[in-house]
Amino acid sequence: MAQYLCLNQEETKQLLDAYEIDTIGAFTFYRRKHIQTFFKEADHVLDQDHPMTEQFTYSEEVLIDDVYTGKINVEHILYTLYSHETREENPHVRIMEQPYEMSLILDSFNHLSSDMPITHLFCLDNSQKQTKNHEFYNLQCLNNLLPVILRNKNYHPYYYYSNVSIMNEHDVFYPNVMITTRYVFTYTNDHSQGILYKTPQIVNAFKEKFDAYIKEASCFMTRESWVDNLTDIQTFFNTQTITRELMTTPCPTYVFEESDLAIMRKSLKDFFPDKEGFIKQFHDFANYWNQEFYTRYSDLFHIIYTVQGLRYTAKTGYLHDIPPELFNPLSLEDRLLLITKWKEFCKKHPYIMMADMPYLSETSTTYFQLSDQVFHMIAADSTGTLANISIQEVTLVEAFNDFFENVIKKNAYSKEEEIKLIDECIEMIKKEM
């Protein structure tokens, strides 16, 4: 039809988009677009270093009960309250504000302390109404809060549902609140005005009401630090029902045998922390994977990797599993062995699928794992420790499941095409040898 109508590339795209919107609905169409953007930007959020401020000047400002006007003054009070709270014996900050507006403030807080217990209550949308920018509001909240939970292991977000689009259309009387040990600060959505209270009875009343709300709310996401990387991953597989895993490059853990451990040993840089301990973990996990886990769950556990990641490993020798700062690239001989074994692994298992996902960086060291109830992102935090971030909110889990199904339907290669592309990489390596 596009050829018949003499449409250019952009007009053809608009026609195809209009057809898809008519087929699946605008909400699902734009939701998939936003999730694609999420994967494109995920490594920027998850893999970036989060430097902490070594020293800062604690505010000695004496706060008084008053009305504060102007965004600069309101945000100065928020920052000062947090600064004061860091010096309390049992610090705890309670916040009720939408992540859409609050993320920059939370991020700046963590320059003062990455250990501050923060309980954050906010509202998510359950309306499926499109905003004027076709935004997926709940995903935007996730984007804003990921850097916070990566930096602060004591950050605990909770949510309740309401129609956010209706809420945003009406002015609400001082809807936001920050509660510390000694103070309560209520303020407007635009941070133009706030009221500070420090009467103990008022502070305690706000704490009691906030804690009552938390009991009725649901956990948005959790963070679990994995210090013993592969051992913790094995425990994770034993306790979670994972149905899909998304990664970029071939994974040596799934195909290397005991005779291949020398490859990993020479590839890990000399300063790799507890190098021999990691090699032992690698060996133990490979045995667990091949002899226990995948023999039982190969029909349930679907692995998606990308053609971009395959080519990246073939060309560079780098892997998805280990950050390049800690890893010497595989030699041509070792690349050939890995990709040849990966080919046999893929031929044997129909649920190992290669997909074309150019928006997901081939250098990504982040794993994405999904079940029917939880979406997991496994990434390095600011200390280099693996952090398993688990999102449990229903609309987001549903959205990621839908996105993965669509990737498999539209962007996954057939098994014959997959093997052909792997063979091309094998031939490329052989020509360089």
For each feature predicted by the language model, list its residue ranges.
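Generic hydrophobic secondary-structure signal
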Residues: 1, 5-9, 15, 201-206, ...
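Hydrophobic protein-protein interaction segments
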Residues: 64-417, 421-425, 429-430
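The feature captures two recurrent sequence modes
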Residues: 38-75
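Aromatic-residue detector
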Residues: 1-8, 19, 177, 321-322, ...
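Short amphipathic recognition helices of helix-turn-helix/homeodomain-type DNA-binding modules
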Residues: 3-53
